[in-house]
Amino acid sequence: MPNTTKNQVAAADKVRSYAKGVDQAPRKVGLVASLVRGRTVNDALVILAHTPKRAAKPVIKAIESARANAINNHGFDGKTLIISTLSVTTGTRLKRFVPASRGRALPFQKKSSNILVEVTGALKPVKATPATAEKEPTKEESK
């Protein structure tokens, strides 16, 4: 299941997004993540768009997923979102072998990463609805 994204809510004020199985070592992804940790979401996306690292792409996807969850599912204002947590942990390791001389095989591991993004921000103000006038019951309601 490489590059799957799992989304959930931690608390009322934080929204999480996971990107699991990113096919790159966590040490390399962590370097990119440290560039944008603690910044606003919009600033982070601009910085990552101009970062010449392969790891920037999955970090962008995870941040955009967290932003979309916060706006669409939880009613946050997109302009006020801040990355409160951006952590990179080790994912599953694939054990492989590379051929060597004299019929030998040398083992190595393909590393993967899990990215966790938590965003916080202000909720959108709820628009006041106009007072609804008393309406006459319809035929179905009067029965």
Question: Where are each of the predicted segments found?
Answer:
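Short acidic DE-rich linear segments
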Residues: 137-143
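Structured, basic alpha/beta domains of bacterial-type, RNA-associated proteins
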Residues: 2-24, 28-35, 39-137
